[in-house]
Amino acid sequence: TPSWLRGAVIYQIFPDRFRRSGKTPLPVQCKNWVFREAWGDDPAAGPDENGVVLNNDFFGGDLPGIEESLPYLAGLGVNVIYLNPIFQAYSNHRYDTADYEKIDPLLGTEEDFRRLCISARALGIRIILDGVFNHTGSHSRYFNKDGAFDSLGAYQSKESPYFDWYSFTSWPAEYA
């Protein structure tokens, strides 16, 4: 354990639900998304009429919103922020990573993340990312089930550089 983590006050943040700055525009990436205009609206819960849990409702919390809250968090004694996934994904929880090299545009830009880290550090706060590197979403540049990415995904070809990342029972239709 790093010495700076011993005795730390850690605050976990689910970025979409933490604070909306109003600085990050909502890009149109998926026709099935629901954007909650009112911060106090109830989030969607449970499966839809087909029994599928979509995780497709967004409240617009973003990285600049987190940065705006840093003085408040520092005042609480927080010295470590644990951020749930921030990489591009299709769900609000972002555990279905689409691209590990891109900050989800719903949360902001790489520059927004850089500013957040610099501002946090200036207040004595460290940032820990929840890096989900043991799985991706099926709609990712690595699996590319729907063909939305330019890269050759494991679902599309056994020649994909990412093919070995996945376990197929019967390629391509059956996978774990």
What is the role of each PLM region?
Residues T1-S3:
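Extended acidic/polar, glycine-enriched regions
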Residues L5-G7, R94:
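A short, structural micro-pattern
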Residues P15-N79, I86-R114, I118-A176:
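Substrate-binding/active-site clefts of carbohydrate-active enzymes
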Residues V9-F14:
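Mature N-terminal segment immediately following signal peptide/propeptide cleavage
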